[in-house]
From Swiss-Prot:
Belongs to the UPF0250 family. This is UPF0250 protein Shewana3_0990. InterPro entries: UPF0250_YbeD-like, YbeD-like_sf. GO terms for cellular component: cytosol. Signal peptide: none annotated.
Length: 88
């Protein structure tokens, strides 16, 4: 797992925003929601913004997380989506 200090800095459960930056592809949002649904089922309404040149999309989604491990798992899974460049 990742070596983070989320457990020292946060109280769980809490809403946590993830920003996924990836290649501009219309399926990116659906892929992000699918990964989140596997780990935290719910009704999500992500926001999507295109980069100034339109080459990339950033998808922001707020997820209720229950632990440090939950956050780290989501970071790892979201980073594994095809076309994803960064997860913030």
């Amino acid at each position: 797992m990742l070596n983070t200090k989320f457990d020292e800095l946060m109280e769980f459960p809490c809403a946590f925003p993830f920003k996924v930056v990836g290649d501009a592809h219309e399926a990116l949002t659906d892929r992000v929601v699918a990964v989140v649904q596997r780990h935290a089922p719910g009704d999500y309404s992500p926001t999507v913004k295109a980069s100034s040149k339109g080459s990339y999309y950033s998808v922001t989604i707020r997820v209720t997380v229950t632990s440090k491990d939950h956050i780290e798992t989501l970071y790892t899974e979201l980073a594994g989506i095809e076309g994803v460049r960064r997860v913030l």
